[in-house]
Amino acid sequence: MDIAVQERGAFGWALVTLSPGERFVSEAGALFRISDNIDFDVTTRSRESGGLMSGLKRMLSGESFFFSTYTCADDNGGEVGLAPKLQGEVKLIECDGKSRWLTTGGSYLGSTEDLDIDTQFQGIKGMLSGESLSFLSIEGRGQLLVNAFGRITEIDVADSLTVDTGHVVAFEDALEYSV
């Protein structure tokens, strides 16, 4: 599998090239082009976790209720083009399996099928912040696509930093945070 971010900046999108038998997962509604030999299915689950309850929890976090899963159906390989619903930048994150990533509402675009996706509740502070009640929790070894309305700036936090949760895209769970 090859994932390439195209058109960096305000009009970003991702081209996922699948080899025979490979699968990729995205938020429903992200697909804008697909090869004829790619099968896709829409479900409420990522891998073997969740189902209806996971879909409802994702909705509370500002994400889609459904996932789309793309599978290369023959021996030739194929392509899937994904774009965020709102124009903005797309970033590819390599997940090493040692840490968990948290994404904020609306920033998950897609991932390799070997990543586990769940919802992490922020508590009453999340509800009072005016933003989503939860984050998507993503762990495992694989690749993750996130997006933002506008540009994504990667920041290494040394001491402390205050950022409005409405402007956070994704962060590793090793980062101590409060809402």
Regions found by a protein language model. Give the residues of each.
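Composition-driven recognition of glycine/serine/threonine/acidic- and proline-rich low-complexity segments
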Residues: 1-179
